[in-house]
Structures are given as C-alpha cells and as structure tokens.
C-alpha cells in the first residue's frame, strides 16, 4: 500500500524482497532487505519519489536495507559480486511492474552458470571461516556467520536443490 501511496506504482519501478525477507525468513530485529529495480537510469525526479517512501518505512518501524538500481547497474553489480548474485536468487516481487518479476533470475542466469555460482559460494564460505575461526567457542558466538551458522544452512539449502530457485526454506 505504501508503494501506491507514494505513487511509485506510477513509475516503472519494481520492489523486490531480498535476503532473509526474500527467503521468507524475516527474524525479529532484522533489517528488511529490499531492491527497487528500474529499467531506466535512476534520475533525480525518481529519487525525489523514493525518498519519502523510504522515510515512511523508517517512521513505521521498518529498518530497510534498501538498494535502488537500474537494470544496467544491477547487471554490473551481479556480474562482479556473489553477494548481489545471491540476493537476486532470493528476490521475490512485492509491488510494481510485474513484467519485471523475472528480471532478477534473468540477470543471475546471464552472469553466473550454476557451476560458477556454487564455486563462488564455496569460496565465500571458506573466506568467512577464516574470518570467524574458532568463534564457536566465544562467549557470544556469531550464529549467523560462524562455521555451522545460518549462512552455512542457507548454502546447504542451495546445494541440495535441483535448481537454486527451487529450494525451500
């Protein structure tokens, strides 16, 4: 309803849930990962429409982790960053131009073969393990990033699905 209230439905923007919200795993006190995707470059007039929408999200108690990108910018970011690619894999349309609903997967498939994606996820996990070495013995272990944490569970779910998009949470 906020998307329409701020007349973002009158634009070519599409609002996607990504991350935990895209997976349907929003936890208490989590930020809400969102992607606003435009087929055209983001100009100042569009930014002027987006700003009050984001402010209202904050006002009603939502902690948005919002990314605003054109399709071209998203394509470039996806090509270079496994984190962006993963967010596109988990993207779920919330509002806007339904014609763009499949764009996140199209961008992912354009830039990443399944093998390349899985290899990058494994490299990401190895890097995370080095960073969080032996943190499972800390007084307050990092349940999200430490070995055996939520990030590993999500990676396992990706590996055990016939297609990454087919996996269930």
Question: Where on the chain are the PLM-derived regions?
Answer:
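Active-site nucleotide-donor binding segment shared across nucleotidyl transfer reactions
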Residues: 1-47
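Conserved structured core elements
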Residues: 29, 44-47, 51, 119, ...
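C-terminal or mid-to-C-terminal helical accessory/interaction module adjacent to the motor/catalytic core
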Residues: 86-138
């Amino acid at each position: 309803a906020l998307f329409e209230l701020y007349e973002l439905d009158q634009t070519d923007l599409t609002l996607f849930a990504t991350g935990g919200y895209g997976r349907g795993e929003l936890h208490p006190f989590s930020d809400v990962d969102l992607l606003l995707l435009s087929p055209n470059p983001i100009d100042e007039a569009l930014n002027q429409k987006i700003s009050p929408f984001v402010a209202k999200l904050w006002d009603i108690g939502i902690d948005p982790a919002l990314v605003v990108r054109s399709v071209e910018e998203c394509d470039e970011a996806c090509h270079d960053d496994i984190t962006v690619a993963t967010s596109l894999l988990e993207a779920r349309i919330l509002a806007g131009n339904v014609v763009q609903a499949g764009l996140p997967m199209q961008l992912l498939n354009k830039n990443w073969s399944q093998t390349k994606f899985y290899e990058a996820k494994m490299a990401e996990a190895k890097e995370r393990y080095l960073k969080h070495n032996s943190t499972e013995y800390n007084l307050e272990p990092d349940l999200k990033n430490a070995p055996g944490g939520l990030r590993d569970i999500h990676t396992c779910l990706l590996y055990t699905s016939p297609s990454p998009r087919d996996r269930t949470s």
